[in-house]
Regions:
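Two-metal-ion RNase H-like nuclease active-site motif
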Residues: 101-111
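Short, basic alpha-helical/linker "hinge" immediately adjacent to a nucleic-acid-recognition surface
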Residues: 1-23, 34
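Active-site beta-loop-alpha junctions of metal-dependent nucleic acid enzymes
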Residues: 112-115, 132-155
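Mobile genetic element proteins and their domesticated derivatives, centered on retroelements
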Residues: 17, 31, 48, 107, ...
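Basic, flexible linker segments flanking DNA-binding modules
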Residues: 42-96
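C-terminal domain-tail junction helix/linker
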Residues: 210-260
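RNase H-like two-metal-ion nuclease catalytic core shared by retroviral integrases
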Residues: 163-165, 170-173, 185-208, 215-226
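Short, basic interhelical loop/turn and adjoining N-cap
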Residues: 26, 35-47
Length: 260
């Protein structure tokens, strides 16, 4: 099992991160990609975000140099209501760094005013393969059932799930138990930690525009959108589609189950 990196940065390493953030306006992702070539041990961008968060908690202002400042700060202090939640800080590095298939991000695409039906969207962090389904309401029982149904038939082994702190995911322990996975929660108001699902939801909104009542979207259309996205070439995959990328990987022998 991968162990999380501890905060033992040298003074020189901290100075490098601080300078690139404040002076050069580099993102944590860019800094992490250049960290080793600058003469330091390799670190992930999530490690740098954690470093920034600890600096903020100590009264520092590094966070003000982030491009997504508004999302990072949030609107108010979060008061959690989900018991036994495991923080994304505990998620293994192999999942953070997109080194394998099976690490999933899940979310809801909701109707106006959060009323009525929603789309349960899930995406594999490495392949960008997605699974979309319709849920009649946001109760924990309904959402849990749809998440388990979709990911049980996705066509490859699921290893981890990461979501936000919405109360619709309060039944996370049941989901994790039924699927045999580890379940993690992103930090409150930290959408940057769930970049894959944020991007997927943006693509969904191109085909099902924001403001659409999901009650009026039939199941067939949702599955058509799913198929379009899974067959859409991606630059990050070397211009392969998620389906094409998965077909080239070992361990995806049940490719026939994948929705094309």
């Amino acid at each position: 099992m991968c162990r999380r990196q501890e905060f033992h940065l040298t003074i020189a390493a901290k100075d490098y991160i601080n300078d690139k953030l404040v002076s050069d306006k580099w993102s944590p992702m860019v800094i992490s990609k250049h960290f080793e070539s600058a003469g330091f041990d390799t670190i992930s961008h999530t490690y740098i975000y954690s470093y920034i968060r600890k600096d903020k908690e100590s009264g520092g202002e590094l966070y003000k140099s982030l491009a997504n400042l508004n999302k990072y700060q949030g609107k108010k202090k979060y008061k959690g209501s989900i018991s036994n939640r495991v923080s994304i800080d505990k998620r293994p590095d192999v999942a953070n760094d997109r080194k394998r298939i099976g690490d999933i991000e899940t979310d809801l695409v909701v109707s106006p005013k959060n009323q009525g039906s929603s789309i349960v969207s899930s995406v594999d962090r490495l392949s960008r393969f997605c699974c979309l389904d319709k849920v009649a309401n946001k109760t924990k029982e309904s959402v849990s059932e749809i998440v388990v149904r979709g990911l049980s038939n996705i066509g490859f082994d699921i290893l981890t799930i990461t979501t936000d702190n919405g109360t619709e995911f309060i039944d996370h322990e049941s989901i994790a138990s039924q699927l045999g996975v580890s379940y993690y929660f992103a930090d409150p108001y930290s959408s940057y930690q769930r970049g894959s699902i944020e991007q997927l939801n943006g693509l969904i909104r191109r085909l099902i525009p924001k403001g659409t009542f999901i009650d009026e979207v039939d199941y067939h259309l949702i599955k058509t959108v799913e198929s379009k996205l899974n067959n859409r070439p991606r630059k990050v995959l070397g211009w392969l589609s998620p389906i094409e990328y998965l077909m080239k990987q070992d361990g995806c022998g049940e490719i026939g189950q994948l929705r094309v």
